[in-house]
From Swiss-Prot:
Domain of life: Eukaryota
Source organism of this protein record: Drosophila virilis
Protein name per Swiss-Prot or TrEMBL: Flap endonuclease 1
PANTHER family xrefs: FLAP ENDONUCLEASE 1, FLAP ENDONUCLEASE FAMILY MEMBER
Gene Ontology CC terms, in alphabetical order: mitochondrion; nucleolus; nucleoplasm
InterPro entries, A to Z: 5-3_exonuclease_C_sf, Flap_endonuc, HhH2, PIN-like_dom_sf, XPG-I_dom, XPG/Rad2, XPG_CS, XPG_DNA_repair_N
Region (Interaction with PCNA) location: 336-344
Length: 386
């Protein structure tokens, strides 16, 4: 689910935090990609196009086709992807997972009714709602990435949190996902639509964490409380508090504790045993592997291994697979070109970095204005009247 309404809130109140770019502008960048989100996109996309790719036994292969060709496209554009897979979900997410199970059950009933009625549009709609990424999908995707020479990371818990940790450690430039909670976990950069197909012609949206905080005029902790108020995966939200009201409350009271002391609970009922403190802890100190100890390596593809894995039962075209492998090898050899900014060391971000940067920027602007004023005054005094 991510954070409800966060993308629009940032677009409305901190538009300077969003930049639209073509994929080619990320040449030379290393990017941590939310693997489960990608696999879901691939399964949905192929199903919505009306052709479910499958093995001779009927097992889906659309996730593998999507992963194979979309990864080649990223590498063709000089981007070095590292895929991050979800681990065990935190206990606090059980409520959200239960809601998803309920929605799935409702979709199954609706699909049955649509099938009996012969309504093709409704059948397609509810079929897509029933798509989910399984452990087998993830296992196959990891095997494919290994043969392609592309690194992946198994997160102990949430993939977005692990991606954010890799960004903060300076291992990669950004997190690529459609879930906005990557920002709540503190990812310095968030890329949306990076893994979308070229046919959709969607520009990549880049969100800057520092500029989000500056634009919203919040500290990192206040931003986390804002996200909890707006609605996250880890706890319920206060009924009647949407994005607009949430930002007003945070700006007025600065934290959830003070909000609860002042809010009109008859108008905005607070959930019973509201576990917002634990949710806050999960965002501040998520369960992640030590990013500094993770060694990311992009190696040459195993062409014969790819043919053996994708062709045969999975029915991929051998010629296309071999052509894909050659593109992978070519992009690996072309990666000797680097971005100019890669010559400079990327320092791991610190919790107070964004707040300090904002203060420093304000002080520099004030100093610059004073200097300019002083120069103008002295120039005026030294000029002779004509």
């Amino acid at each position: 689910m991510g954070i409800l309404g966060l993308s629009k809130l940032i677009a409305d109140l901190a538009p300077q935090a969003i930049r639209e770019s073509e994929i080619k502008n990320f040449f030379g960048r290393k990017v941590a990609i939310d693997a489960s989100m990608c696999l879901y996109q691939f399964l949905i996309a192929v199903r919505s196009e009306g052709a479910q790719l499958a093995t001779v036994n009927g097992d889906p292969t659309s996730h593998l086709m999507g992963m194979f060709y979309r990864t080649i496209r990223l590498l063709d554009n000089g981007i070095k992807p590292v895929y991050v897979f979800d681990g065990q979900p935190p206990d606090l997410k059980s409520g959200e997972l239960a809601k998803r199970a309920e929605r799935r059950e409702e979709a199954e009933k609706a699909l049955k009714a649509a099938t009996e009625a012969g309504d093709e549009a409704e059948i397609d709609k509810f079929n897509r709602r029933l798509v989910r990424v399984t452990k087998e999908h993830s296992r196959e995707a990891k095997e494919l990435l290994k043969l392609m020479g592309v690194p992946y990371v198994d997160a102990p818990c949430e993939a977005e949190a692990q991606c954010a940790a890799l960004v903060k450690a300076g291992k990669v430039y950004a997190t690529a996902t459609e879930d906005m909670d990557a920002l709540t976990f503190g990812s310095c950069k968030l890329l949306r639509y990076l893994t979308y197909s070229e046919a959709r012609k969607m520009p990549v949206k880049e969100f800057s964490y520092d500029k989000v905080l500056q634009g919203l005029e919040l500290t990192s902790k206040e931003f986390i409380d804002l996200c909890i108020l707006m609605g996250c995966d880890y706890c319920e939200s206060i009924k009647g508090v949407g994005p607009k009201r949430a930002i007003e409350l945070i700006k007025s009271y600065r934290d959830i504790e003070t909000i609860l002391e002042n809010i009109d609970t008859s108008k905005y009922p607070v959930p019973e045993n509201w576990n917002y403190k634990r949710a806050r802890e999960l965002f501040i100190e998520p369960d992640v592997a030590d990013a500094s100890a993770i060694d990311l390596k992009w190696t040459e593809p195993d062409e014969d291994g790819l043919v053996q894995f994708l062709c045969g039962d999975r029915q991929f075209n051998e010629e296309r697979v071999r052509n894909g492998a050659k593109k992978l090898l070519k992009s690996k050899q072309a990666q000797t070109q680097v971005r100019l900014d890669s010559f400079f060391t990327t320092l791991p971000s610190t919790p107070n970095a964004s707040t300090s940067a904002a203060k420093r920027k304000a002080e520099e602007a004030k100093k610059s204005a004073n200097n300019k004023k002083a120069k103008t005054s002295s120039a005026g005094r030294g000029r002779r009247p004509k």
